[in-house]
């Protein structure tokens, strides 16, 4: 089993203040950039499918999508991660605002924001691998949440870059199963998404 010592200090992966610097947000392919769009919408049947249908009909790609009720049970908050130029994201925002169920749309990447994603990963952990997998979990501030004689299941949270770095650091042959939630984001400071 070989491990790539990608980063022994997780602060090198996740900025200390949880911000994603502007120069690390860009994919820089013809001005394409990763955007996190936060949508407040009515919590009713069919609302999610109409938003996804809008993206599909116009050929926009959704990298990740999370949705859950808010503190107001009549509203849900949807977080969409998509890649596109500023013009494309502006068009997406305009189209989203036209949907009757949509209450408010904000591109979080226009200001300071905090982003988190959850990953559960089941790894083969036998013999000498067990201690190495535990060490890797500790380095990335993960938690071992399930243990068997042959496996560890590790919970990791952070931005997408941190989770990707963990996947690169462990031996691919040791990865048995992975599930990720997709990004959730919230504006920093006084920025609040409310009606």
Roles of regions detected by a PLM:
Residues 2-77, 81-195:
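Long, contiguous binding/interaction regions
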